[in-house]
Regions:
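Amphipathic, hydrophobic secondary-structure cores in small proteins
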Residues: 27, 98-99, 108
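Generic alpha-helical hydrophobic packing signal
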Residues: 17-18, 37, 89-91, 117
Length: 129
């Protein structure tokens, strides 16, 4: 599901920063709002420009898209953590999700909170092959 074995930085927090990203990818794989809620801060926004207008969801709206029914083609889907940049209590990450003919490129801002690293915001683009 992810490239968890490949270190992208020498930062001592890398493993901890990966936790919410891997929860996010697992949430997609299992179609699980529970995993998404564990990955994101409750105040997170998820945004993209799709076919012109801005799409902007709060976490509750985003989680309504998940109903614990993995996609029929789940076995063929790929998800990778491509880049990580970590400085102090802030980080950014790029994740690629290949879901059939659609490739999603996700950019995340993460923060180290009292509950550990969490995704603060996500901006994404969907490209149809």
């Amino acid at each position: 599901m992810s490239n968890t074995a490949t270190r992208l930085t020498s930062h001592p927090e890398e493993a901890a920063v990966r936790v919410p990203l891997e929860l996010y990818m697992r949430g997609h794989a299992e179609d699980s709002a529970e995993h998404m809620r564990a990955a994101f801060m409750p105040t997170a926004r998820l945004e993209s420009v799709r076919e012109g207008p801005l799409t902007s969801w709060d976490l509750d709206t985003y989680c309504q898209r998940f109903n614990n029914t993995p996609a029929a083609d789940e076995a063929t889907r790929r998800r990778t953590i491509d880049t990580l940049d970590i400085v102090g209590t802030a980080a950014s990450a790029k994740v690629t999700l290949v879901h059939g003919s659609i490739t999603f490129t996700d950019y995340f801002v993460l923060l180290k909170t009292a509950q550990g690293w969490k995704i603060a915001n996500k901006a994404f683009h969907a490209q149809v092959a």
